From Swiss-Prot:
Keywords: Ribonucleoprotein, Ribosomal protein, RNA-binding, rRNA-binding. PANTHER family: 50S RIBOSOMAL PROTEIN L9 (PTHR21368). This is Large ribosomal subunit protein bL9. NCBIfam families: L9. Belongs to the bacterial ribosomal protein bL9 family. It comes from the Bacteria. Residues 166-184 have a biased composition (Low complexity). Binds to the 23S rRNA. GO terms for molecular function: rRNA binding; structural constituent of ribosome. The lineage of its organism: Bacteria, Pseudomonadati, Pseudomonadota, Alphaproteobacteria, Hyphomonadales. The gene is rplI.
Length: 194
């Protein structure tokens, strides 16, 4: 199906482009959301008449998104989640979680605007892209930790997972030393009894 785009759409085109898309994509997404018109003579004329208004509306939306992006720039959202000793989360952090954290911090971010390549499954700092408009994108930091104290340590640059592993290794070494000492002591005692 041929459609006329009313706004810039990634991997499809810019305002006014006439592109071919699958029927379902046009009928179920582009047309109902007001992102495109069916490409026929009537709609081509209508688009040309309304082109300036459409471009002005898109420019206003882009400017509003740019203002929000300037506010979001450098923002760090802290998410407290349960995790194992290795730093592996029991669940995962999704786009919805990031959007809710942004809302709680007073920013207006839609879940669909958050771009995660894959869910976050470990504690630590992650960079997440937020696309507020087709032409406006911003990177934010997501700090996933088991407690607010860990989150503060991570913000200062400490690698919590490495610290946990070092702590676990030190504890294992200490226990191994205690076991070796106990075995040596038991060996000495055994020699006295015989």
């Amino acid at each position: 199906m041929q459609v006329i785009l009313l706004e810039r759409i990634d991997r499809l085109g810019k305002i006014g482009d006439e592109v071919r898309v699958k029927n379902g994509f046009a009928r179920n997404f582009l047309i109902p959301q007001g992102k495109a018109l069916i490409a026929n003579d009537k709609n081509r004329k209508r688009f040309e008449i309304e082109r300036d208004a459409i471009e002005a509306r898109n420019a206003a939306a882009r400017d509003a998104a740019q203002t929000e992006a300037d506010n979001l720039e450098g923002a760090i959202f802290v998410l407290i989640r349960q995790a194992g000793e290795t730093g592996q989360l029991y669940g995962s952090v999704t786009a919805r979680d990031v959007a809710e954290a942004a809302e709680a911090a007073g920013y207006k971010v839609d879940r669909a605007a958050v771009r995660l390549d894959k869910p976050i499954k470990a504690v630590g700092l992650s960079e997440v892209s937020v696309r507020l408009h087709a032409e406006v994108s911003v990177k934010v930091q997501v700090n996933v930790a088991r407690s607010t104290e860990e989150a503060e340590r991570q913000e200062k640059g400490e690698d919590i997972v490495a610290a946990l592993q070092a702590e676990n290794q030190a504890q294992a070494d200490e226990q191994a030393g205690e076991l070796a000492a106990a075995a040596a002591e038991r060996g000495d005692m055994g020699g006295d009894e015989e």
